[in-house]
């Protein structure tokens, strides 16, 4: 997706290119029109909803449907959906990732990510994670648990602030 988180774009443009893998970016509001971007060699449809830069929400079910019709795996960066507000696997996404640093940990003192997959892709995800040496230290796990204890309170405050912001914006435009 075109509004993808900058380090993800850099990964595609700098590292994947070196491995002979090409990336095609598409507008986040493409929806079912994603079929026009799928090529015979497309392996993964990467979504980010809401998007990091513009907060645009993608039509995930429509895009997953098209991807499935073309035998393309779907992966969604669910950092802002955080698993409580949006559950990608329930909408057909194959792999969901998120930066645990943001909402799960919540204190910016741990660098951590989370990946979950459906039954089809879980064995591959688990094995590749192991082969790449990805693991969490005991200290980071402890700090993540600390963040989980306050996550509900923090997200409730985020929600209240967002509603107030929208209400205030509507009043100022009336």
Mark where each language-model region is:
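Conserved PLP-enzyme active-site core in the AAT-like
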Residues: 1-169
